[in-house]
């Protein structure tokens, strides 16, 4: 009772064909195919820039730092 038999699927298919008709279903499938094709094309375009080597990153520059006695001298005004 919980599973769908072949007759259930035939009735569902007949209702879908009556509601949408042959032309609308083929148009819908064409739109889905175009979407998949453009998605694959976008993925291929994203891969192309990754193949070209990028400029090496800049070496990090050390931050200037002070010794603790020099830092405390700046905090306390004379």
Swiss-Prot record:
Pfam families associated with the record: TatA_B_E
TM stretches of this protein: 1-21
GO cellular component: TAT protein transport complex
GO molecular function, a single term: protein transmembrane transporter activity
InterPro entries: TatA/B/E, TatA/E
Chain intervals with Pro residues compositional bias: 54-63
Region of interest (Disordered), ranges: 43-78
GO biological process: protein transport by the Tat complex
Record keywords, A-Z: Cell inner membrane, Cell membrane, Membrane, Protein transport, Translocation, Transmembrane, Transmembrane helix, Transport
Membrane topology classification: Single-pass membrane protein
Superkingdom of source: Bacteria
Location within or outside the cell: Cell inner membrane
Keyword Cell membrane: yes
Quaternary organization: The Tat system comprises two distinct complexes: a TatABC complex, containing multiple copies of TatA, TatB and TatC subunits, and a separate TatA complex, containing only TatA subunits. Substrates initially bind to the TatABC complex, which probably triggers association of the separate TatA complex to form the active translocon.
General function of this protein: Part of the twin-arginine translocation (Tat) system that transports large folded proteins containing a characteristic twin-arginine motif in their signal peptide across membranes. TatA could form the protein-conducting channel of the Tat system.
Family to which this protein belongs: Belongs to the TatA/E family.
Protein known as: Sec-independent protein translocase protein TatA
UniProt source species: Xanthobacter autotrophicus (strain ATCC BAA-1158 / Py2)
Name of encoding gene: tatA
